């Protein structure tokens, strides 16, 4: 009898042991599979400080310093950042130095290094890339595009352009896989040029040592210059402002191929299908669901994000400051914005070489993401 009891106890302990081993194996497999599903941002090795002569590190602050300064100076902005979805910030490359094509002699037309690049435009490509456009403040170098990995924030490459334009407006047409860039023609009038995604992915500045080629270009009848631009539902929305005449926004309807309609041309200039008056200090525009987002900035005063319900189809409707449904205060020198998936991506130029000399300025050396459903101090009609 004792032998039987001892045998039963041994069998029980053996079963318990097997169960524990199986649980351990299942837990290990689940842990490994789960870790593969998530992008291990915290395990990514730091990139080199320079990649092909373009700086990849923040120009002004460490991540900890940046968070502290933003939370101290703009606490409501800080509270509305999305810390759950990584990356929280995108470091703006090229602010310390950037590869570029020399515009002026000596070395005109040759690759060189620019130390005064000023970020202006922002675009997101298929949740794959985030692109920042920049121009040389001294006009010594041609303008560039910096390409970042959208999911990790890591720098990918620099794309050289064949002009010294402000490139304040860039936008991606996800329907036709085409990036549009606002430029200026030889008559100093506004034009837009495009490059297909496949060419962006193929381009290698280090090997080619020359600017990327635009595929299409169209001269515009209005505005005379371009301050900002966005693509939305087969239309390009292009705007401009000056301090005297205020702001204007023009819509250009594209054809099925995503290009300007030939029957909407006059004297070689594309004609807009619609136009609206806007607030006079608009730097960026974007659409997100039923909202229109406008960024305003001028000088070293605080910037503003204006959120409107989309009523562009209503007659006599204008995007004036008084019509905004919500106004959010942000740091100075905000440029282009993008509304996407309930978040607003914001680019600033306050960390350029020129503005870094101002010790009283918060140098926004990163693109930040703000929730559209902002909670905090704001002016709202709701």
For the regions a language model picked out, list residue spans one by one:
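Beta-strand-rich domains and repeat architectures in extracellular enzymes and scaffolds
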Residues: 59, 63-70, 102-141
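Structural motif
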Residues: 139-146, 187-199, 244-255, 300-311, ...
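Loop/turn-rich, solvent-exposed surfaces of beta-rich toroidal or solenoidal domains
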Residues: 273-315
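Surface loop/turn motifs at the tips and blade-to-blade linkers of beta-strand repeat domains
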Residues: 110-115, 159-163, 217-222, 273-278, ...
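Structural signature of eukaryotic scaffold interfaces centered on beta-propeller domains
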Residues: 112-126, 168-177, 221-237, 283-288, ...
């Amino acid at each position: 009898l004792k032998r039987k009891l001892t045998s039963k106890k041994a069998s029980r302990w053996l079963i318990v042991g097997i169960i524990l081993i199986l649980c351990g194996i299942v837990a290990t497999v689940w842990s490994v599979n789960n870790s593969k599903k998530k992008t291990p941002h915290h395990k990514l090795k730091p990139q080199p400080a320079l990649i092909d002569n373009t700086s990849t590190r923040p120009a002004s602050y460490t991540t900890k310093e940046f968070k502290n300064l933003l939370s101290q100076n703009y606490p409501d902005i800080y509270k509305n950042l999305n810390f759950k979805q990584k990356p929280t910030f995108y470091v703006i490359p090229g602010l310390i130095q950037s590869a570029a094509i020399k515009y002026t002699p000596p070395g005109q037309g040759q690759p060189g290094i620019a130390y005064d690049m000023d970020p202006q435009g922002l675009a997101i490509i298929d949740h794959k890339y985030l692109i920042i456009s920049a121009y040389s403040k001294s006009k010594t170098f041609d303008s560039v595009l910096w390409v970042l990995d959208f999911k990790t924030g890591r720098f990918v490459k620099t794309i050289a352009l064949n002009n010294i334009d402000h490139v304040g407006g860039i936008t991606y047409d996800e329907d036709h896989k085409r990036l549009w860039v606002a430029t200026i023609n030889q008559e100093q009038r506004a034009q837009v040029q495009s490059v297909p995604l496949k060419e962006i992915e193929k381009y290698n500045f280090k090997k080619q040592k020359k600017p990327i080629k635009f595929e299409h270009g169209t001269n515009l009848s209005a505005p005379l210059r371009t301050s900002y631009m966005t693509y939305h539902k087969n239309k390009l929305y292009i705007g401009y402002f000056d301090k005297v005449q205020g702001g204007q926004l023009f819509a250009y309807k594209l054809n099925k191929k995503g290009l300007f309609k030939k029957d909407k041309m006059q004297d070689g200039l594309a004609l807009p299908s619609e136009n609206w008056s806007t607030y006079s200090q608009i730097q960026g525009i974007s659409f997100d669901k039923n909202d229109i987002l406008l960024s305003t900035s001028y000088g070293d005063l605080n910037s503003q994000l204006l959120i409107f319900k989309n009523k562009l189809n209503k007659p006599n409707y204008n995007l004036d400051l008084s019509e905004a449904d919500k106004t959010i205060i942000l740091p100075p020198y905000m440029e282009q914005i993008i509304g996407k998936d309930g978040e607003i991506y914001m680019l600033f130029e306050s960390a350029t070489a020129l503005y870094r000399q101002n010790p009283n300025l918060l140098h926004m050396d990163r693109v930040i993401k703000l929730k559209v459903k902002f909670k905090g101090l704001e002016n709202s009609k709701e």
